[in-house]
Amino acid sequence: MAQTLLNDTFLRALLREPTDYTPIWLMRQAGRYLPEYNATRARAGSFLGLAKQPDYATEVTLQPLERFPLDAAILFSDILTIPDAMGLGLDFAAGEGPKFAHPVRTEADVAKLAVPDIGATLGYVTDAVREIRRALTDGEGRQRVPLIGFSGSPWTLACYMVEGGGSDDFRTVKSMAYARPDLMHRILDVNAQAVAAYLNAQIEAGAQAVMIFDTWGGALADGGYQRFSLDYVRRVLAQLKREHDGARVPAIAFTKGGGLWLEELAATGVDAVGLDWTVNLGRARERVAGRVALQGNLDPTILFAPPEAIRAEARAVLDSYGNHPGHVFNLGHGISQFTPPEHVAELVDEVHRHSRAIRSGAGS
């Protein structure tokens, strides 16, 4: 049975086509701010139990869509699945974030790195993509909203692989980048091949758009960013399947703290660039001059404000972009676990309401 996408607003916005309103989805929209997510995670036993079991991953992917009229679903997974599949021993200690049992710090460590067999080691992710697509589709083949697949960027994965977990200053990985750039580039080359293979597997399984999260690209200096992050994002994009089942598969790239390099990121071959909250959206639109769509960029902490303040800030973001195609509303980073769900409802409603008013010429 042929599938029909009931709401393709998100995909059309990524391709800079006119839309009746501005689509919205949120980074970490399936997460700890939702009581139902916490209940499912408790049943799964752990975060990795949640991410590695397709039925649980499907359940939590759909939870925010049951609460809010969001315009896209995003696969529930983690950016560190690739280094875990490389055998680095990923674990999430309570209250400590991700840790790797076998960080990559020596020549011998780097020599052991290889692109994982995606089907053999990450089949649970592609199984989840297929299961989520089925769950989004009714008995008559009508799919509610598109599904986004994703990966961490080669540099961001390397940050965790070399540090062995999160870091306040990334001194271990940055020291390697400048003291032993040969080792750093070998890690990044393997990572770029792995990210491209991983995203292509998600596309073949049914992801209708993909996003590269370069969470720590902004930790690099100008010059270092181009060598160690941007160049490898470009390599990933060059290897991506951009069409599947006769449809364009848009790609989004997001560098947190990367506003300085917006024009360079827009020139990598992406369809859309994600922006954090430090960037003026209207000026960003002028800077990219219609070459790419833009995604963002409300400060996530605004969701702790009273509802009318949330609505006012949402309007400010929309007004900044103006009545132009190519905007996907999102936060400038992931939603906080402490966010009241009812505040998310206010945001989604205002984005849809006010963007329709802008399109109609009614303003506020």
From Swiss-Prot:
Its main location: cytoplasm. Its EC number is 4.1.1.37. InterPro entries: UROD/MetE-like_sf, Uroporphyrinogen_deCO2ase_HemE, Uroporphyrinogen_deCOase. One of its GO terms (cellular component) is cytosol. Keywords: Cytoplasm, Decarboxylase, Lyase, Porphyrin biosynthesis. Pfam families: URO-D. One of its GO terms (biological process) is protoporphyrinogen IX biosynthetic process from glutamate. It is found in: Cytoplasm. The keyword Amino-acid biosynthesis does not apply. Belongs to the uroporphyrinogen decarboxylase family. This is Uroporphyrinogen decarboxylase. It comes from Burkholderia mallei (strain SAVP1). The gene is hemE.
